[in-house]
């Protein structure tokens, strides 16, 4: 989020402003395009933007991201939806500027395999032992590889 001074940001799952407001109030985004399908959340977002004095730097789009999200204008796109934002990845890629590299902030839950969970639970009555850093790194690398492969598929589909 930080390092977005002067940037145009798209927040695909804006809600009431969990990420929208910090981008505008603290991180210095020039303009943010906030997409939200829930009209009650969108109304609360508008109120929160006004209360924080940044409503003039945010455009709120109500509806399905695939239909309302802007295209080819973002320096970065936030996908703050869990357990997975994968359904929004193609929309996010379309939102990025086409003339320069951009940044996608992908939110996703990482799961632990049953075997690993069982091994950790054997650590004692306190619920297990800490997961070794090497395991966390391996899980992160596998997740990153999966995300990279999926992003390449989406990018290829967008150029067709």
Predicted feature residues:
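Short beta-strand element of Class I
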Residues: 30-35, 104
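Short glycine-aspartate micro-motif
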Residues: 9, 32, 78
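S-adenosyl-L-methionine
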Residues: 35-76, 84
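C-terminal catalytic and target-recognition region of SAM-dependent MTase-like enzymes
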Residues: 73-75, 84-86, 91, 98-160
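Conserved class I S-adenosyl-L-methionine
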Residues: 6-15
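Glycine-rich helix-loop-beta junction characteristic of Rossmann-like nucleotide cofactor-binding loops
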Residues: 1-5, 25, 71
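A generic alpha-to-beta junction signature in SAM-dependent methyltransferases
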Residues: 3, 27, 96-98
